[in-house]
């Protein structure tokens, strides 16, 4: 992969509104979004987003003000987000699985002036979740749809009508003043290791990084991109609809992952591009009616975000017919992508690594003293490059702890670089547990357990043990719901891995607890394990 060529794009196209204007000049009549059988062209998307920007300006939003979005994957999400950017604002996406108190905390800490949120979703009327919790800094709550209860201030149509209070000229002047290095979004990390922190990222790195990403993974002009990854996550936002718009592709939003619905939509809409975490594809592969669907339109996919079992790449190619499968690695603090495999990489490389550094990115692995380790040696993954975050919002201490004086981002992930510069992530530093003095990395054990013929999904956690300090517990979801023979499973483990890696406990579950991004929630899983183990006799 070559270095990013900033000169290939004019400076005016290195802001998100500028990028959209550039794409509209080339693909004005092409479908940008298809939802419920209705199409929004690129020209219409720009028109709607500028109306949304004018409405926000009429509500008092100034350049640099934060505007929050709390909704599933809907066309209005994209319109509103583009509107925030076109008003010079900073987008604050909120996870739809958050409870009211969690959302209120982020709204208060970000001092969001306006919230655009879904109405009825997941058995909740979302504005009601903020009853008694709404921060005083939150001036307006706009609810999508028509239903306006007292907890909301206006619906989407009423909001868009506010555009009349600001002229098109004033909005375009605001848009023209946006600079590529202005903050575009404030994304709060998932909080799997503590209280969520707000990651600030600018326009320029998002555009350059995901232009490079798109060119490699096979997202092209005219691709039909089914976005299951939530828009509030970088995988659904930046590697999702932003990347699609950059390339002149068509976005097909999907609100909730359901294997039956996804398979049907791939067939009916002739979807060609479908990224997602491993759990998405494992769920599709486990669908009993998989062979009844015509998936021949699927050409390309990208996976990552958690452990990728080598067998999964093979099954995606052979059973789903996706020939162009690549893997990638990134985190919110680096804009969502740092390394990437290429289509020309062999199956073993794609299955066992997450690729090499994006153009303009440096990757190294270091020991506990911060010294670089050699090829094949494990160490903490450090990243440096143009797309590293601007910092954590109003948290200098956390920023300094994460980005060192030389500009290296300390990821907290453990990885290995090979002689070619390809990265393999082995685990999270904080997920590691120690069995009798031996370091155990759950992702490494999960990778091996995924090769067991009866395992569909697996996650490993460490639990306290009086004799060994900690021992492993494997939580298994079997293929087609077969009952796992635990003695035979343990015997298989002993034959395939070092004895200290063999799980002491095996729990068969109907499903693993995941968040809206389909990442396994290890803290929730650990609680399930503790509850289950407390009720059964422990082995000697």
UniProtKB/Swiss-Prot annotation:
It catalyses: 3-[(3aS,4S,7aS)-7a-methyl-1,5-dioxo-octahydro-1H-inden-4-yl]propanoate + ATP + CoA = 3-[(3aS,4S,7aS)-7a-methyl-1,5-dioxo-octahydro-1H-inden-4-yl]propanoyl-CoA + AMP + diphosphate. Its EC number is 6.2.1.41. Disruption phenotype: Cells lacking this gene accumulate 9,17-dioxo-1,2,3,4,10,19-hexanorandrostan-5-oic acid (HIP) when incubated with 1,4-androstadiene-3,17-dione (ADD). InterPro entries: AMP-bd_C (IPR025110), AMP-bd_C_sf (IPR045851), AMP-binding_CS (IPR020845), AMP-dep_synth/lig_dom (IPR000873), ANL_N_sf (IPR042099). This is 3-[(3aS,4S,7aS)-7a-methyl-1,5-dioxo-octahydro-1H-inden-4-yl]propanoyl:CoA ligase. It comes from Comamonas testosteroni. ATP binds at residues 189-197, 413, 428, 519. Involved in the catabolism of the rings C and D of cholesterol. Catalyzes the ATP-dependent CoA thioesterification of 3aalpha-H-4alpha(3'-propanoate)-7abeta-methylhexahydro-1,5-indanedione (HIP) to yield HIP-CoA. Transmembrane segments: none annotated. Keywords: ATP-binding, Cholesterol metabolism, Ligase, Lipid metabolism, Nucleotide-binding, Steroid metabolism, Sterol metabolism. GO terms for molecular function: ATP binding; medium-chain fatty acid-CoA ligase activity. One of its GO terms (biological process) is cholesterol metabolic process. Pfam families: AMP-binding (PF00501), AMP-binding_C (PF13193). Belongs to the ATP-dependent AMP-binding enzyme family. The keyword Ligase applies.
């Amino acid at each position: 992969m070559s270095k990013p060529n900033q000169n290939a794009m004019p400076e005016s196209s290195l802001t998100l509104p500028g990028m959209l204007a550039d794409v509209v000049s080339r693909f004005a009549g092409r479908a940008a979004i298809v939802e419920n059988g209705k199409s929004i062209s690129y020209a219409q998307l720009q028109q709607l987003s500028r109306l949304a920007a004018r409405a926000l300006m009429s509500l008092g939003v100034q350049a640099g003000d934060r505007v929050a979005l709390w909704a599933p994957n809907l066309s209005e999400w994209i319109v509103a987000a583009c509107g925030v950017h076109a008003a010079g604002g900073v987008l604050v996406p909120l996870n739809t699985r958050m409870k009211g108190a969690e959302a209120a905390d982020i709204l208060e800490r970000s001092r969001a002036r306006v919230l655009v949120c879904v109405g009825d979703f997941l058995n909740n009327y979302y504005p009601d979740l903020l009853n008694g919790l709404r921060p005083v800094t939150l001036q307006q709550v706009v609810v999508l749809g028509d239903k306006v209860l007292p907890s909301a201030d206006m619906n989407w149509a009423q909001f868009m009508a506010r555009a009349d209070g600001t002229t098109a000229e004033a909005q375009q002047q605001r848009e023209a003043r946006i600079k590529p290095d202005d903050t575009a979004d404030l994304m709060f990390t998932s909080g799997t290791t503590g209280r969520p922190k707000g990651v600030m990222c600018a326009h320029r790195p998002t555009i350059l990084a995901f232009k490079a990403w798109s060119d490699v993974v096979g997202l092209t002009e005219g691709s039909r991109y089914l976005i299951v990854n939530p828009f509030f996550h970088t995988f659904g936002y930046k590697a999702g609809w932003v990347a699609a718009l950059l390339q002149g592709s068509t976005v097909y939003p999907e609100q909730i992952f359901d294997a039956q619905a996804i398979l049907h939509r791939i067939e009916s809409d002739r979807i060609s591009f479908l990224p997602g975490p491993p759990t998405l594809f494992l769920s599709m592969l486990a669908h009993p009616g998989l062979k009844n669907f015509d998936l021949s339109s699927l050409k390309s996919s990208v996976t990552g975000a958690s452990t990728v079992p080598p067998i999964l790449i093979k099954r995606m190619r052979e059973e789903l017919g996706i020939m162009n499968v690549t893997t990638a690695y990134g985190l919110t603090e680096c804009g969502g992508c740092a390394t990437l495999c290429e289509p020309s990489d062999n199956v073993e490389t794609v299955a066992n690594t997450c690729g090499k550094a994006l153009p303009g990115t440096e990757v190294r692995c270091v020991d506990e003293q911060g010294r670089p380790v050699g090829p094949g040696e494990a160490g903490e993954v450090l990243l440096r490059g143009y797309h590293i975050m601007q910092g954590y919002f109003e948290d200098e201490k956390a920023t300094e702890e994460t980005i060192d004086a030389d500009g290296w981002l300390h990821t907290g992930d453990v990885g290995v670089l090979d002689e070619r510069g390809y990265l393999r992530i082995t685990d999270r530093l904080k997920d590691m547990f120690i069995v009798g003095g031996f370091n155990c990395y759950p992702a490494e054990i999960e990778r091996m357990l995924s090769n067991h013929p009866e395992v569909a999904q697996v996650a490993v956690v460490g639990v306290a043990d009086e004799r060994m300090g900690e021992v492993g517990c494997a939580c298994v979801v079997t293929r087609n719901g077969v009952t796992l023979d635990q003695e035979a499973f343990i015997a298989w483990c002993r034959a395939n891995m070092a004895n200290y890696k063999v799980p002491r406990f095996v729990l068969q579950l109907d499903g693993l607890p995941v968040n809206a991004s389909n990442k396994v929630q290890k803290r929730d899983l650990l609680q399930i394990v503790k509850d289950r183990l407390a009720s059964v006799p422990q082995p000697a």
